[in-house]
Curated annotation (Swiss-Prot):
Residues cleaved off as propeptide: 23-82, 83-102
Protein name: Dibasic-processing endoprotease
Species of origin: Schizosaccharomyces pombe (strain 972 / ATCC 24843) (Fission yeast)
The record's account of how the chain is modified after translation: N-glycosylated.
Peptidase S8 domain: residues covered: 128-440
Length: 709
């Protein structure tokens, strides 16, 4: 056999060995660790037998370390003995998780007048009904007055936390900025789509900033900039997710997030430690203290009876959660019932989808779901920020509420309810549909809100069981808490914004429970609706719900929590306790105090040792080494906070580095070595062939038969 033929099998065997030996996470677990400010994290890691990896970009005193797999017991013991001395406050295992894109499958005189008026020559503009709907006048974003006034999103950057942006697309080249962009999946600067289904981010970006040229259609805010933060092309850890949501948060103004946990009617998932703190960090320190604007798609699980209050990203008070309405003002099949969504924007349904950009310089007519609705809201926010850059993240949410347009819907279960503040609210559409002209008009003269305040009720212990009790079947329970005038005054409360409710209800079929919150005015928010596919047997363990339905409603009076077993007593569980929190605008902005965000996020019985995160169907490991009780024995009297302060976590005020300082992944190492070995193999083969040919040419010709004779 020719020696060169042996190289292939030998190389394959060697590479297989190389891959198995190079994977750093093959034998190690990655952990997030928080240390005391004065502690050297490398020394602290060594003190517990771990290897230091790198700092977390966005959070001070938070670092990543590696521990050998299977060493949890010994590590815990070591931490208990030496962790506090080493200055370690908290340890949490990092588990890569998938985040799911929230996509959905599926010329006349007026139109010509509109396009000619604005000089739009894009060939597919006639298909962008969400911009100008000539078939159903008024069923669009109402952009004429905004564009006539010359507002196109200048000096605003929308960052798409997604699967990348094709910034070479002729519709996006001018809008793209590398300043706030990064590929967190491949750890490189350019977030170009690489996989066959990396289309989502490019489509979302085109909705906002597609150029007015002769390609595809146009964007809502064509002079805005777009940045790409690529995270959706592989499972990612909580730490990396948090870095993406804080990346470039002085240059990126809006973070458009059309993704979340699975919309299957079964999942219940929330941000873990680092991402929770990144959201807090963003609203406190982003945009020079005005707050990053986080826009989240509400979810596409309507046909599974899902509810966005089972998603800790969309039910966060820091998120502007956007639902969808179709071209005929019907409820799309994928639309979720949810008390946490502020407003709806146009998207797919009734045989029409959103026309936008697609990778490789192409266009698509099939973008949809709440994935398409959220970028439209981001675009409208960009239009407003271009003329009012002083608006805070809470101002944007207020203007969203006050400018929303309720509408008549052919859908029978739209169910608009008038609130005491004079708004109309639907659990399908929020406060109505987004109207760009109304939003910008309200924003122009908006008086910025005072700093945030809060009132936290004591934990209400109920401790009553569902099911058969003393020959009686218990299926309904009600618990009450009275907010007094004195509490309102001591809490420095002026206007109600968000209401959150934390519950602890172990139940052996979570999907059978319905949870409602009734305000003193009798307005009911559906916090948890029945989910027939949710067979989880743990119930709600310290899960926090949120509602915006009570915005600007008088908070004084009796608040009721109603918990119903919709199975009619077929299942068992216990309503253990609940806690009400009211968030709003302060009366006296000079009377400030640090906000209790992080205290509220920590479980009330966190103790030294491994703790399983309750706010998720996934299990993560946490170790808190400075035992802190966060249970409340009386209502919390608060004042307000400046947008840059908190007493519970150290928050960086500096801009994250333009490029993350990350270690090369084992895939990159293997790829480099593979390339090097293949190059060497080809080089040797060529040299071998050349030498063989050379010696063959130099060798004397073989003797003929006559010469042999």
């Amino acid at each position: 056999m020719h020696p060169a033929l042996l190289c292939g099998p030998i190389l394959a065997i060697f590479l297989q060995f190389l891959v198995s030996s190079c994977s750093p996470l093959e034998n190690d677990d990655l952990f997030l660790v928080q240390v005391e400010p004065e502690v050297d994290p490398v020394v602290a890691a060594e003190a517990i037998g771990a290897k230091y990896v790198r700092p977390l970009l966005n959070l001070k005193y938070h670092h990543l370390i590696k521990l050998h797999k299977g060493s949890d017991d010994s590590v815990q013991s070591s931490i208990r003995k030496r962790g506090i001395d080493a200055g370690i406050l908290e340890l949490e295992r990092q588990t890569p998780r998938w985040r799911y894109k929230r996509d959905a499958s599926e010329s006349d005189e007026l139109l010509n007048e509109f396009s000619n008026h604005f000089g739009i020559s894009d060939p597919l503009f006639y298909g962008q009904w969400h911009i100008f709907n000539s078939n159903n006048p008024g069923h669009d974003l109402n952009l004429r007055e905004v564009w006539d006034a010359g507002y196109f999103g200048e000096n605003v950057t929308v960052a798409f936390v997604d699967d990348g942006i094709d910034f070479k697309h002729p519709d996006l080249q001018a809008a793209y900025t590398s300043l706030g962009s990064w590929d967190f999946n491949d750890n490189i600067a350019d977030p170009l789509p690489k996989l066959s289904d990396d289309q989502h981010g490019t489509r979302c970006a085109g909705e906002v900033a597609a150029a007015w040229n002769d390609v595809c259609g146009v964007g809502i805010a064509p002079r805005a900039k777009v940045a790409g933060l690529r995270i959706l092309s592989a499972p990612i850890t909580d730490a990396v997710e948090s870095e993406a949501l804080n990346y470039g948060f002085q240059t990126n103004h809006i973070y458009s997030c059309s993704w979340g946990p699975a919309d299957d009617g079964r999942a219940m998932d929330a941000p873990n430690t680092a991402t929770r703190r990144a959201l807090m960090n963003g609203v406190l320190n982003g945009r020079n203290g005005l707050g990053s604007i986080f826009v989240f798609a509400s979810g596409n699980g309507g046909h599974y009876h899902d509810n966005c209050n089972f998603d800790g990203y969309t039910n966060s008070i820091f998120s502007a959660t956007i639902g969808a309405v179709d071209a005929e003002h019907k409820i799309p099949f994928y639309s979720e019932v949810c008390a946490a969504q502020l407003v709806s924007a146009y998207s797919s349904g009734s045989h029409l989808s959103i026309l936008t950009t697609n990778p490789e310089g192409t266009c698509t007519r099939s973008h949809g779901g709440t994935s398409a609705a959220a970028p439209l809201a981001s675009a409208v926010y960009a239009l407003a920020l271009s003329i009012r850059p002083d608006l805070s993240w809470r101002d944007i949410q207020h203007i969203t509420v006050y400018s929303a347009s309720p509408f008549d819907s052919p859908s029978q279960n739209a169910e608009w309810q008038k609130t005491p503040a004079g708004f109309q609210f639907s659990h399908h559409f929020g406060f109505g549909k987004l109207d760009a002209s109304k939003f910008v008009e309200v924003a122009k003269d908006w008086q910025v809100v005072n700093p945030q305040t809060w009132l936290i009720a004591p934990e209400i212990n109920v401790n009553k069981s569902f099911g058969s009790v003393n020959n009686e079947t218990i299926t309904e329970m009600v618990s009450e808490f009275t907010v007094t005038k004195d509490m309102i005054e001591k809490s420095n409360f002026k206007r109600l914004e968000h209401v959150t409710v934390r519950v602890c209800i172990p139940f052996n079929r979570r999907g059978a429970l319905e949870i409602l919150l009734e305000s003193p005015s009798g307005i009911r928010s559906i916090l948890a609706s029945e989910r027939p596919y949710d067979e989880n047997s743990k119930g709600f363990l310290d899960w926090t719900f949120m509602t915006v339905q009570h915005w600007a409603e008088p908070p004084e009076g009796v608040w009721k929590l109603l918990v119903n077993d919709r199975s009619g007593g077929k299942h068992e569980g216990t309503f253990e306790n609940w806690q009400l929190a009211l968030w709003g605008e302060s009366e006296n902005p000079s009377n400030t105090a640090p906000l209790p965000y992080d205290t509220l996020e920590l479980p009330k019985e966190m103790v030294l040792g491994i703790y399983s995160e309750p706010n998720s169907d996934l299990t993560n490991s946490s170790t808190l080494l400075s035992p802190t009780s966060t249970s409340f024995t009386s209502y919390t009297v608060s004042a307000t906070a400046t947008p840059t302060s908190t007493s519970h976590i150290p928050i960086p005020t500096v801009l994250p580095p333009t490029q993350p300082v990350l270690e090369p992944s084992y895939r990159e190492i293997v790829a480099f070595i593979t390339f090097f070995l293949l190059f060497a193999f080809i080089f040797v083969a060529v040299i071998w062939t050349w030498i063989s040919a050379f010696w063959k040419a130099k060798a004397p010709p073989p003797l003929s038969q006559q010469e042999i004779a």
